[in-house]
């Protein structure tokens, strides 16, 4: 009986010893990003990095300079606004300007697919004012209220010639905020 108990205890100790072995290996790196701002509002995370889908259009729509696609709305949300710090907010966009019409964003060359030609992307504010992508053309000021504020914009394709060619028609722009 005593031998059986010792054998059972020894077996249990061996199982416990093998089950407690742990290996420590490198798992990777996590990069945390953020920013503290001394401003009237903070830009909502979803607004800081967004995709505006302009859609798919036939090339024959752009058979004259200035022809446009449908306006596609998008917003920039501001959080934790304090109108005592600043009463108004405005936005300016910056990106590669179209070579023919510098009021438009240039269509970026695509490495894996064909790039569309004959159009650029026009950005407008909530008053339909065109926002040149130069980082200096600010939207109309919007009065800030305490808390959350939503700034409204729209974008569309605009013809730069008398014809367009099919392909990807993408562009990137950054934006800056001005508080007054």
From Swiss-Prot:
Q: Where is the protein localized?
A: Fimbrium
Source domain of life is Bacteria
Q: Which residues form the signal peptide?
A: 1-22
Instruction: Say yes or no: keyword Signal present.
Output: yes
Other facts: The operon is cryptic under classical laboratory conditions, but is functional when constitutively expressed.
Q: Which family does it belong to?
A: Belongs to the fimbrial protein family.
**What function is annotated for this protein?**
Part of the sfmACDHF fimbrial operon. Could contribute to adhesion to various surfaces in specific environmental niches. Increases adhesion to eukaryotic T24 bladder epithelial cells in the absence of fim genes.
Could you identify this protein by its name?
Uncharacterized fimbrial-like protein SfmA
């Amino acid at each position: 009986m005593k031998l059986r108990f010792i054998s059972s205890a020894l077996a249990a100790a061996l199982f416990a010893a093998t089950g407690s072995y742990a290996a420590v290996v490198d798992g990777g790196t996590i990069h945390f990003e953020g920013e503290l701002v001394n401003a009237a509002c903070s830009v909502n995370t979803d607004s800081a990095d967004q995709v505006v889908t302009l859609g798919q259009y036939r090339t024959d729509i752009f058979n004259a300079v200035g022809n446009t696609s449908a306006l596609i709305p998008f917003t920039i949300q501001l959080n934790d606004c304090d109108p005592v710090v600043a009463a108004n907010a405005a936005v300016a966009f910056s990106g590669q300007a179209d070579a023919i019409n510098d009021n438009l964003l240039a269509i970026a060359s695509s490495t894996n697919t064909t790039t569309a030609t004959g159009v650029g992307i026009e950005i407008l504010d909530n008053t339909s004012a065109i926002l040149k992508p130069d980082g200096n053309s600010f939207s109309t000021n919007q009065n800030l209220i305490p808390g959350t504020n939503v700034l409204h914009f729209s974008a569309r394709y605009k013809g730069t010639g008398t014809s367009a060619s099919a392909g990807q028609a993408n562009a990137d722009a950054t934006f800056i905020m001005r508080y007054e």
